[in-house]
Swiss-Prot record:
Reactions mediated catalytically: (4R)-hydroxy-(6R)-2,2,6-trimethylcyclohexanone + NAD(+) = (6R)-2,2,6-trimethyl-1,4-cyclohexanedione + NADH + H(+)
EC supergroup of this enzyme: oxidoreductase
Key word Oxidoreductase present: yes
Taxonomic superkingdom: Bacteria
Assigned EC number: 1.1.1.-
Single annotated GO MF: oxidoreductase activity
Similarity field: Belongs to the short-chain dehydrogenases/reductases (SDR) family.
Gene: lvr
Name under which the protein is recorded: Levodione reductase
Organism: Leifsonia aquatica (Corynebacterium aquaticum)
Length: 267
């Protein structure tokens, strides 16, 4: 089975909530899960991104049920609103891909402003916490649920020039493990993925920061240290997320899964 092929019934009648659903990993995962029968609640700060993701989902799965909600994941009231919208529409939340995030500026720590640090941590860590806080209550009352948080290889090792991103993603790893220990007794599994160099709009922007004049050269040089010598693709991440949210991963809990072509082992 390839990363883009899938069973057709694994998520039938299951409701999956995806933040950051308007692009990149969120969109690819939405398409994957819809192909497997999921009902989707997609959340993003971009209404245009959400509409594009919904169109991509319906192209793959014309009968899919898709709810879209524009929200800033760092705003508690907006998080409450997207969770409420999901439960009012579907009645439950079986899976949660807690994925929204930004990269932020690339600067050494002494040049990384407090304002930029706060911005990145607010979205990448506070946003993950707020989503968990609201969704876990629902899952506990249901007696079941699966969560996948998006961390990063930058959350399991040092990467340099990204103080806010590294701090937030390390925090996501800690939050994942702590919450998994707390909620396993309620039939809830909480894991995280740690993507590496996956070619998404975020990584493309990162290359532009590294070399504004020649981002393609920066991209080619960056990937040479990766044992796989290539960038990953969003559907490859979606396949792992789908596994972790499915019953196939029924005894996988409190785990952080690198999806990086061997990058974290080589550094």
């Amino acid at each position: 089975m390839t990363a883009t092929s899938s069973p057709t019934t694994r998520f039938t009648d299951r409701v999956v909530l995806i933040t950051g659903g308007g692009s990149g990993l969120g969109r690819a995962t939405a398409v994957r899960l819809a192909a497997e029968g999921a009902k989707l609640s997609l959340v993003d700060v971009s209404s245009e991104g959400l509409e594009a993701s919904k169109a991509a989902v319906l192209e793959t799965a014309p009968d899919a049920e898709v709810l879209t909600t524009v929200a800033d994941v760092s705003d508690e009231a907006q998080v409450e609103a997207y969770v409420t919208a999901t439960t009012e529409r579907f009645g439950r939340i079986d899976g949660f891909f807690n994925n929204a995030g930004i990269e932020g500026k690339q600067n050494p720590t002494e040049s990384f402003t407090a304002a930029e640090f706060d911005k990145v941590v607010s979205i990448n860590l506070r946003g993950v916490f707020l989503g968990l806080e609201k969704v876990l209550k629902i899952m506990r009352e249901q007696g079941s649920g699966m969560v996948v948080n998006t961390a990063s290889v930058g959350g399991i090792r040092g990467i340099g020039n990204q103080s806010g991103y590294a701090a937030a993603k390390h925090g996501v790893v800690g939050l994942t493990r702590n919450s998994a220990v707390e909620y396993g007794r309620y039939g809830i599994r909480i894991n995280a993925i740690a993507p590496g160099a996956i070619w998404t709009p975020m990584v493309e922007n990162s290359m532009k920061q590294l070399d504004p004049e020649n981002p393609r050269k920066a991209a080619e040089e960056f990937i040479q240290v990766n044992p796989s010598k290539r960038y990953g693709e969003a559907p490859e991440i979606a396949a792992v997320v789908a596994f972790l949210l499915s019953d196939d991963a029924s005894y996988v809990n409190a785990t952080v899964v690198p999806i990086d072509g061997g990058q974290s082992a080589a550094y």
